[in-house]
Amino acid sequence: DRVVDGTDRFAQYAIAAAVQAVDACGMDELDAERTAVVIGTSCGGTETIADSQRSLDLEGPTGVDRKLQIKAWTNMAAGQIALRWKLHGPLLTVTTACASSIDAIGTAARMIERGDCDVAIAGGCEASRTQVTMIAAGIYGMLSPQPDPYKACRPFNTERFGIMGGEGAGVIILERADLAKARGAKIHGYLRGYASLSDGFHPSSSNPDGSW
């Protein structure tokens, strides 16, 4: 399969999630010029880069994946989704660490509000659990040492220990409310607002006073 051969796992997750979302939304077809794709990812194709570095070390230049560039670029999750449905609307990738997915959804909603598009395929994906990234996260002190999975990842708890590595994708379909109602869509919810900011405190820690 050319799509699988030409994509990193992070993009494959996004494509699979987008297919499920589009199938569930009930549209007969997407308007190619009025549909946007906005996908968030923090790391992109780290697995492809790690595998190619390993092959380079063992085999030399001939071992490097010839498609490394198009597989590793963070924009290729959104790009592959647009390619699948031959879309010509706005195409964006959002990379804001742990906020990438929600920022992608919020950005897509604002694009609909501005009239840039009527529909948006929006969400996020990640597949960065390579040996080197997990070791680095552990050395940096990011990973939770808690063995109980129900207590290991509690980011908003005062007794939090750290984060856990995970991967996957989540994609939703945003649509102008009047259009969704007119076609009798099953509406799961309304996005009433969105905000994005930085606390300007630390590269990886939130300000403990919670002011931002």
Identify what each model region corresponds to.
Residues D1-T96, C125-M134:
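Conserved beta-ketoacyl condensing-enzyme motif
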Residues G26, G115, E175-L179:
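Short loop segments at secondary-structure junctions
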Residues E47-T62, M111-R114, M134-P147, P208-S211:
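A glycine- and small-aliphatic-rich helix-loop capping segment at beta-alpha/alpha-beta transitions
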Residues S101:
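Short conserved active-site loop signatures built around small residues
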Residues D116-A120:
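Short, high-confidence coil segments that cap the C-terminus of an alpha-helix
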Residues G124-E159:
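Phosphate/pyrophosphate-binding betaalpha-module
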Residues D148-W212:
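Condensing-enzyme catalytic core mediating Claisen C-C bond formation in acyl metabolism
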